[in-house]
Structures are given as structure tokens and as C-alpha cells.
């Protein structure tokens, strides 16, 4: 499988489990723990990494309210199963999605929340600990991240997106990429 192939040229140091909304309806929480245990045990065995840290992200508390997420009313029950799993299994750490916000679709987290969640994941991984509340300084850290200069690759990607979305012409795209590469 791809994970085993990737291990040949890189080091696998952790696994991020981000379930999201799919099982947060129709009583699926009742079998969630058992299903997750089968998956995690099989994954650790297949990768020959029995002690690899698993960082488990909770579901956002914006679910069950509007848009495509309106039917996901059992997200708190899934979160309880995820948290229970992380507390009971070795080298598993739960990361709360408390306070994160969604895109207008009501089901996916927005860009700022993705950054906050990423900071929480990093904190859980680097400290090998559960993150049960928003980080005290996450707003300041997100501001710092967002105010930094973009890398050359990021600048080219943004120009590529503008071109793909028809915001700039091909000639403008080539001109901008050439300028970025020459800076």
C-alpha cells in the first residue's frame, strides 16, 4: 500500500485521524469506537508501527445547525467516542474542535479554523497530550502565520489559481511567474 511505500523514502512519525461528519447521524456513534479500533489496530500492524502516535480531531460544534451539516446532530456523541478512544488507547491524543467555525456550507471548517486546528494538532503531537480546549494564544499565532511573507512556491500557486479561475490572462500569468522566479 502507499503508506508502506512512502516509508521507504521518509519517516512516518504520526497519524492524523480527522473523521468529520459522516458518522454523526443515524445512530452510527453506537458502533464507532469498535470500528475505529479495528482500523487503528490494522493500520499500526500494516505499517509495523505499534506505538505511532495517533492525533484524533474532534467534530466542530457548528454541526447540526445549518446547511449540509444540519443532519449531523450526533456530533457530540461521536466526539465522546473519539475522546474516549484517545484516552483509552496508548499513544492516542484527542484534539477538540471547540469554537471552530464553518464555511457557509455548514459542514466544512473555514480557512482560519483550519489554521487553528493545525496549531492544536501540532500542540498535541509535540507534547503528546490531549488538547481539550482552544489554545490560549491561537488567535495571535494565526495572525502571525497569516502576516508572514509568502514563499516563492505559494506566490506561484496563487498566480496559478488566478489563471485557472480566469482572473488573469495567460500572458499575465507567465509575466507574473517570471517576475516571481527572478525576485
PLM segments and residue spans:
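Cell-envelope and extracellular/periplasmic
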Residues: 1-183
Amino acid at each position: 500500500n502507499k503508506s508502506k511505500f512512502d516509508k521507504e523514502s521518509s519517516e512516518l512519525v504520526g497519524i492524523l485521524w480527522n473523521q468529520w461528519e459522516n458518522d454523526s447521524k443515524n445512530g452510527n456513534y453506537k458502533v464507532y469506537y469498535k470500528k475505529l479500533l479495528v482500523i487503528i489496530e490494522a493500520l499500526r500492524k500494516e505499517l509495523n508501527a505499534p506505538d505511532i502516535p495517533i492525533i484524533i480531531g474532534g467534530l466542530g460544534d457548528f454541526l447540526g445547525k445549518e446547511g449540509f451539516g444540519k443532519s449531523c446532530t450526533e456530533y457530540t456523541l461521536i466526539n465522546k467516542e473519539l475522546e474516549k478512544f484517545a484516552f483509552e488507547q496508548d499513544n492516542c491524543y484527542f484534539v477538540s474542535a471547540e469554537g471552530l467555525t464553518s464555511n457557509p456550507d455548514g459542514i466544512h471548517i473555514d480557512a482560519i479554523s483550519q489554521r487553528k486546528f493545525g496549531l492544536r494538532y501540532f500542540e498535541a503531537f509535540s507534547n503528546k497530550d490531549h488538547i481539550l480546549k482552544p489554545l490560549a494564544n491561537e488567535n495571535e499565532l494565526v495572525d502571525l502565520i497569516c502576516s508572514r511573507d509568502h514563499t516563492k512556491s505559494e506566490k506561484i500557486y496563487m498566480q496559478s489559481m488566478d489563471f485557472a479561475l480566469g482572473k488573469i490572462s495567460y500572458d499575465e500569468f507567465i509575466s507574473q511567474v517570471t517576475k516571481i522566479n527572478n525576485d
